[in-house]
């Protein structure tokens, strides 16, 4: 397939409104693709170049991309950036920008999908002092060989957001329709392979190609997620008894071991082995089996109590000074699930069976404590214990649940203190991406400090597409400054925002940040003078610390 045909396909899909129409349109194309093009087409369609688990990363930021496009157009990068600021969509802006320039280099070639993929592979492989130059040269060649229309989708692909409204579920169902297999079979294969491109290749073989698949070390699996909102009585009523574990204030990890080699992956499936060597060493010595384990890394303070999760997160992101950081902060793994052992895939076993295998695999030192309980009173007591020890709450797990990679469902439920809310004024925003490209995607919030607004946090979660349009209408005439992707508003609109925790943070002028901020509503009934003050925010922060130290007041 030529990239020009891929771009036309994207445009046709972008113009579609219905998911079923999109699914069918994709399913018609798939059987015509070669074995080489099929996985590339699938990944590109989802705005990806490499599988999520792949160590290959493109490493191209907007500035380098804009520099390459400006060179092809024979003009300055600032002119392109100005156009992007006005449109809010880099792909459309680049198309318009190149269309207005006479550039004889266009169409010297009509690259195929495979050629574009090969160029991206060269970019990902570039390293050393000349890597930036090498990447720029490849980008120039790519954009010099496509039309302005094709450049729209090439730019979006490189930036990782195709903006055509295609999700994993649509592609999954299109694969099923194209090759006459069940969507559930495609989903199961996706859970094992974590790459819909490879799943499509397997599906070409029919049902036989999708069965007997197994997960394997060093190919990370999306992590199963928990949902909030379900109560303790509801879980017990549904399941009779549940496994109850502490909900740790740490960072999720996946541990892979084969022989004497181990690797650790973050929730984003990025390898972080070198950043947290003590975790790998601990678990490597804890088992002789080849395994894939799921758990949480927590940081422990000198008093034996857990430290905030940002402490662990900083370690996960660290590239240098690992030895010194290791001396300063104690990291401990808490393992609560096992997905694979000695060649056997375990995700289709019930949780209680996986737990029994896990207990026999790593021993008690790093095993997350668990109790199987059947009464709300017993769960309440464990919840109190978790809070008193400085944890976030408890996890309730269905003993019969299978491991569903990447799924947030009712089989795992987190019980935490009720979410508090703050009233904060909106002082700025960032333009959105994807479906939010022509609206504001996230909003900057502030509290009041002696007549001065101090930034506290950004919020993007909890806002529906309809609300985004309403908020755009509300704010569009209140823009007082714009720079790059950010705008500044007159501080007149108040948001009520829920949050899980107030945290110390140098990232915002107030000195605080909100963990898991979520939009609740616009407070039209409040004046700006009534918003949260820095003093009251500090009071909330200190009270929150007191609760964590063993005097909690909460509602179950």
UniProtKB/Swiss-Prot annotation:
Enzyme class at the top of the EC tree: ligase
GO process terms (BP): cell division; DNA biosynthetic process; DNA recombination; DNA repair; lagging strand elongation
Superkingdom of the organism of origin: Archaea
Role of this protein: DNA ligase that seals nicks in double-stranded DNA during DNA replication, DNA recombination and DNA repair.
Database matches in Gene3D superfamilies: DNA ligase, ATP-dependent, N-terminal domain (1.10.3260.10), DNA ligase/mRNA capping enzyme (3.30.470.30), Nucleic acid-binding proteins (2.40.50.140)
Keywords: ATP-binding, Cell cycle, Cell division, DNA damage, DNA recombination, DNA repair, DNA replication, Ligase, Magnesium, Metal-binding, Nucleotide-binding
SS bonds (residue pairs): none
Pfam families xref list: DNA_ligase_A_C, DNA_ligase_A_M, DNA_ligase_A_N
Known catalytic reactions: ATP + (deoxyribonucleotide)n-3'-hydroxyl + 5'-phospho-(deoxyribonucleotide)m = (deoxyribonucleotide)n+m + AMP + diphosphate
List of residues binding ATP: 245, 252, 267, 296, 336, 408, 414
Cofactors demanded by this protein: Mg(2+)
Annotated active site: 247 (n6-amp-lysine intermediate)
Gene that encodes it: lig
Species: Methanosphaerula palustris (strain ATCC BAA-1556 / DSM 19958 / E1-9c)
NCBIfam families xrefs: dnl1 (TIGR00574)
MF terms (GO), sorted A to Z: ATP binding; DNA binding; DNA ligase (ATP) activity; metal ion binding
Family label: Belongs to the ATP-dependent DNA ligase family.
EC number: 6.5.1.1
Cross-referenced InterPro entries: ATP-dep_DNA_ligase (IPR050191), DNA_ligae_ATP-dep_bac/arc (IPR022865), DNA_ligase_ATP-dep (IPR000977), DNA_ligase_ATP-dep_C (IPR012309), DNA_ligase_ATP-dep_cent (IPR012310), DNA_ligase_ATP-dep_N (IPR012308), DNA_ligase_N_sf (IPR036599), NA-bd_OB-fold (IPR012340)
Record's protein name: DNA ligase
């Amino acid at each position: 397939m030529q990239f020009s045909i891929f771009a036309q396909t994207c445009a046709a899909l972008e113009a579609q409104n219905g998911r079923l129409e999109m699914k069918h349109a994709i399913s018609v194309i798939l059987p015509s693709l070669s074995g080489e093009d099929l996985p590339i087409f699938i990944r590109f369609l989802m705005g990806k170049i490499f599988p999520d688990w792949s160590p290959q990363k493109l490493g191209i930021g907007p500035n380098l991309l804009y520099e390459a496009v400006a060179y092809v157009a024979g003009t300055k990068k600032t002119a392109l950036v100005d156009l992007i600021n006005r449109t809010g969509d880099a792909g459309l802006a680049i198309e318009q920008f190149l269309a207005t320039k006479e550039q004889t280099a266009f169409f010297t070639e009509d690259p195929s999908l495979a050629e574009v993929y090969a160029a991206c592979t060269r970019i990902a492989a570039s390293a050393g002092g000349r890597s930036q130059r090498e990447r720029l040269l490849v980008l120039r060649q790519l954009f010099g060989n496509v039309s302005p229309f094709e450049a729209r989708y090439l730019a979006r692909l490189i930036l990782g957001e195709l903006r055509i409204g295609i999700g994993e579920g649509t592609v999954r169902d299109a694969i099923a329709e194209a090759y006459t297999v069940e969507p559930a079979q495609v989903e199961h294969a996706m859970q094992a392979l974590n790459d819909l491109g490879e799943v499509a290749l397997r599906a070409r073989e029919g049902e036989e190609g999708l069965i007997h698949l197994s997960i394997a070390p060093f190919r990370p699996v999306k992590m199963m997620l928990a949902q909030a909102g379900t109560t303790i009585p509801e879980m017990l009523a549904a399941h009779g008894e549940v496994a109850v574990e502490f909900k740790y204030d740490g960072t999720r990890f996946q541990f892979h071991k084969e022989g004497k080699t181990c690797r650790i992956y973050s929730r984003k499936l990025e390898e972080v082995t070198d950043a947290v060597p003590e975790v790998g060493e601990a678990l490597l010595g804890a088992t002789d089996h080849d395994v894939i384990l799921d758990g949480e890394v927590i940081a422990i303070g000198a008093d034996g109590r857990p430290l905030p999760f940002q402490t662990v997160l900083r370690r996960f992101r660290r590239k240098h000074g690992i030895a010194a950081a290791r001396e300063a902060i104690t990291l401990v793994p808490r393992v609560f699930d096992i997905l694979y052992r000695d060649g056997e895939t375990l995700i289709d076993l019930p949780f209680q069976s996986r737990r029994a295998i896990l207990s026999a695999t790593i021993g008690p030192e790093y095993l997350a404590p668990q109790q199987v309980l059947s009464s709300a009173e017993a769960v309440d007591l464990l919840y109190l214990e978790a809070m008193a020890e400085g944890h976030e709450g408890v996890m309730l797990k269905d003993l019969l649940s299978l491991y569903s990679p990447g799924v947030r469902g009712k089989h795992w439920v987190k019980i935490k203190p009720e979410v508090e809310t703050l009233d904060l004024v909106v002082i700025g925003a960032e333009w959105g991406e994807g479906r939010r490209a022509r609206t504001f995607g996230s909003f900057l919030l502030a509290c009041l400090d002696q007549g001065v607004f101090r930034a506290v946090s950004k919020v993007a979660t909890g806002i529906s597409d309809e609300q985004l349009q309403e908020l755009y209408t509300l704010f569009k005439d209140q823009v007082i400054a714009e720079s790059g992707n950010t705008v500044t508003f007159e501080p007149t609109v108040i948001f009520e925002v829920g949050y899980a925790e107030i945290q110390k943070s140098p990232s915002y002028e107030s000195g605080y940040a909100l963990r898991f901020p979520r939009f609740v509503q616009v407070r039209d009934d409040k004046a700006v003078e009534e918003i949260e003050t820095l003093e009251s925010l500090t009071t909330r922060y200190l009270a929150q610390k007191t609760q964590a130290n063993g005097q909690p007041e909460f509602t179950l």
